[in-house]
Amino acid sequence: MGAAARLSAPRALVLWAALGAAAHIGPAPDPEDWWSYKDNLQGNFVPGPPFWGLVNAAWSLCVVGKRQSPVDVELKRVLYDPFLPPLRLSTGGEKLRGTLYNTGRHVSFLPAPRPVVNVSGGPLLYSHRLSELRLLFGARDGAGSEHQINHQGFSAEVQLIHFNQELYGNLSAATRGPNGLAILSLFVNVAGSSNPFLSRLLNRDTITRISYKNDAYFLQDLSLELLFPESFGFITYQGSLSTPPCSETVTWILIDRALNITSLQMHSLRLLSQNPPSQIFQSLSGNGRPLQPLAHRALRGNRDPRHPERRCRGPNYRLHVDGAPHGR
């Protein structure tokens, strides 16, 4: 039975009516880009998460997939794996540079071709190359992350999207193949202090340059290792992209120690518009997919639940940075 056949009658009626209306309003949308986190934008239907797998056959996994993301991580289900090595970041000893974009869906940082930034270790058997840093956040504090821990959300989630450079030549090819992608997620809370890396992205001089959709601003001299806590544990599972086409080729690595940004920085994020300046303001906030069933997937972690009182200490709980002057 196809995805459309399993669609409930009310949702089917809404979809068919909306598609019929869309057919009479201007040119046809690009099928590869016709999706949103909200079903209604400026009075026009744009497929939100419940409809992603129904408007494009290439996105069918968004409806029928059994390894979808994001998920709610219940810590009691996490299996301690003492053989997980520490995560390793390779920057070649160079500072990161690239372009910060307002894509209309996310705040996105696309690194320049050089230096190449790779991540390995942890659950990864291959080296993965950084392709994008993506920031998701909510309209209110504590409700902006895609993933949850013990049913608890966070104000924002930073996702570092990597592709398997040993098996694939680029992100697009890796999205279509097995063992293709690795996404590192870091959760963000609102507090009185701010993570130094995020402060570079969210200071007033920078964030006001990307107020509207398609705005872009070039940044340089970024130290990516400053994004990570000094010490941390992580939880990993097999999942999918949380945007169309929802490909089930992602190894997710969730860092279990949250970062901080200030309330002013969070407010500045919520003032970003998902539209160009010629259109009505709609906040970029609320740019996450709803939770998906974990089902029978395994959750593995490198923190020993038999000793929850112990803080993460030692080299296994630090990011190993190749090429840094003194490492971490």
UniProtKB/Swiss-Prot annotation:
Q: What is its main location?
A: secreted
Q: Where is the composition biased (Basic and acidic residues)?
A: 319-328
Task: Output the Gene Ontology cellular-component terms.
Answer: basolateral plasma membrane; extracellular region
Kindly indicate where the leader peptide sits in this chain: 1-22
What keywords tag this UniProt record? Answer: Glycoprotein, Secreted, Signal
User: Which PROSITE patterns is this protein grouped with?
Assistant: ALPHA_CA_2 (PS51144)
Q: Where in the cell is it found?
A: Secreted
Start and end of every Alpha-carbonic anhydrase domain? 33-303
Q: Which residues are glycosylated?
A: 118, 170, 260
Give one GO molecular function term: zinc ion binding
| Role | Does not have a catalytic activity.
Family affiliation: Belongs to the alpha-carbonic anhydrase family.
The molecule here is called: Carbonic anhydrase-related protein 11
What is the organism of origin for this protein? Answer: Bos taurus
